[in-house]
Amino acid sequence: MSLTDKEIMDGVLAEFSNLAAIPRKSNHEEAVSNFLKERALSFGCKVVQDEKFNLIIDKEAAKGCEAWPRVIIQGHMDMVCVAAEGVQYDPLTSPIKIINDGEFLRADGTSLGADDGIGVAAAMYLLQQDFNHGPIRAIFTVDEEQGMTGAKALDAKYLLDAKYLINCDSEAFDMLTLSSAGSVNVDAERRITWHKPEHRSAYKFVVKDLHGGHSGEAINCGYANAVKIIAQAINSIMKKTEIELASISSLKARNVIP
């Protein structure tokens, strides 16, 4: 296999464009899972789709390389679905509109889904190539963004017969990270007493247009958090006068700094 960097990039981006056309919100990955399954079968790969819609795709070793160790290429199919204020976007039905300015890809008013669409796209491109390789397995899981329920449900037998696992969900360019990873979700509840408002004046306090970012990758960057700003503002106001709080809300995605 002898390909130029441009040929490889064009091939990966073509696979990514396929993914961008398919809505794939967390816990709604059936359509994209079915698409990838059929596409991998068309490459001559063997495919297992489990009840969670995780995919296990096996590419046989090249001739003469059967004794080489198995390598797993792993990514996830779901994406964080957010849109700018005023943008009409339904994460269950709307495709992602990609804008390519020649240097960067971005989406038109929504999240792009490169996490982890570009990782899945790279793996799908690799599965089509003819080169000297041992057995390759691509594993694509569901619901990584909200709870990793796909990874938790994956049968361990698909991991134990491989020597290497390469996760294609890193945030750093041109870098490999040797580590393990995990996540913890914390749900907190507090009982409150509702009552009819006594004050006639109502005010809406909005914090927007902040930097934002991924709560894992950018949590140490010191970016302002809209929820914290609102809480601090309410606390300051309450020290000076009595207020009644009707509601407070933020982005639905757990892993986005609001």
Would you name each region that the model predicts?
Residues 2-103:
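Acidic/His- and Gly-rich active-site-bordering loop/insert found
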Residues 33, 116-120, 227:
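Short alpha-helical patches at coil-to-helix transitions and adjacent helical residues
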Residues 36, 120-127, 230-234:
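Buried hydrophobic packing segments
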Residues 50-52, 141, 248:
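Conserved beta-strand termini and adjacent loop/short-helix elements that scaffold enzyme active sites
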Residues 65-146, 151-155, 162-163, 202:
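Active-site metal-coordination/substrate-binding segment of hydrolases
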Residues 94-97, 101-106, 110, 145-146, ...:
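Midchain, well-structured core segments that form catalytic/ion-binding scaffolds
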